[in-house]
C-alpha cells in the first residue's frame, strides 16, 4: 500500500502559497480538506470551520477539532480530524489514540487521512474503521473522485444527502 486504500500512489500536491515548499504539512492538509468540503457541499448550505474548540479529549486536554462542518439549518454538525503523514514517523502510535478520542467526541465525526508515511498495519486499521475516510482532493476540486469518495459518503449519510450515494442509479 502506498498511501491510498486501493494501493494506488498518492498524487503529488504542491501548495499554491509557496513555490519553495515541496511537502504538505498537517495544517496544509486540513486546509485542503476544509476547502474541498466547503466548496463541494456549499450548494447544500454546509459551512466548514477550521480549528474549533469542543470540550475535552480522553486525556482531559482542551480539544480543538480540525474541521467542523455545520449543516444548512445549524441543527447538525460533523467533526473531521485530519491526519496526513508523508514520511515514516510516530504517526503509528497516534492513530489508535485518535480513533479512541474520536469515539469520545460528543458529536459525530471521522478522521480524514492521506499520505505515504502510514505503516501497512495502520492503513489497514484506518481503512477498516467506520470512523475514518481516505481523502486527498486536489486544490480547487469540487467534484467527487475516488480520492474523496469515502469522506463524501460519510458526510452524505450524516446529513441525509442520499443522492450523493445513489448518484445516477435508477430505482427498481
Name what the model sees in each region:
Residues 1-6, 70-73, 127-172:
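Non-catalytic C-terminal interaction segments of nucleic acid-processing enzymes
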Residues 1-56:
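Acidic-basic catalytic patches of nuclease active cores, encompassing PD-(D/E)XK
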Residues 29, 60, 90-94:
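Phosphate/oxyanion-binding active-site loops and adjacent basic polyanion-contact surfaces
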Residues 32, 94-96, 148, 152:
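Well-ordered, non-membrane alpha-helical segments in soluble/globular domains
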Residues 33-44, 102-105, 126, 158-162, ...:
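Hydrophobic, Leu/Ile/Phe/Ala-enriched alpha-helical segments that form helix-helix packing faces
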Residues 44, 48-49, 109-110, 133:
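Hydrophobic anchor at the start of a short beta-strand
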Residues 44-74, 89:
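Active-site metal-binding core of divalent-cation-utilizing nuclease and nuclease-like domains
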Residues 75-78, 83-130:
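Catalytic cores of nucleic-acid endonucleases
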